[in-house]
Amino acid sequence: MKNFVLFVICAVMLSSCTTLTRQEHNQLRELQAQGVTVDRPVGNYEKPASGVAAGALNLLPGIGNFYLGTGNAAESSHVLYGVLNLLTWPLSILWAVPEAAIDADNINKRELIYYYTYDKQGKQELKDANIKLSHHKAEEQTHAFEESF
């Protein structure tokens, strides 16, 4: 029974990584093709999560996950991962430190996409930098089509 519980806990921990969807990967590639990355943004975008801080905080029982679950661009599922890491500490250090660093990077990528896709200021910064994304072009065409009626 003890091995089964340990297996379930490990399976939950290994599946707890934050991932990007295919659409988010495509949008990220499009931004990167225009020279916009998490490390080299256009305008005032700031990374909401630090991978180094999240990883270092997870040396303590689950604190890095609580940081990712409650800070800017919070993903609430990380609070649960933090509780599970707390319950399995000190063993959880083995997976929690790299998991938190990777998840912080993915959260930053997701927020970069959101900022330049939906945020008014982010859209304006792309426009000022003369960068057009394909989904913005489609929106402009739809808007022009609607105005013609």
Regions found by a protein language model. Name each.
Residues 62-63:
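Alpha-helical transmembrane segments of multipass membrane proteins
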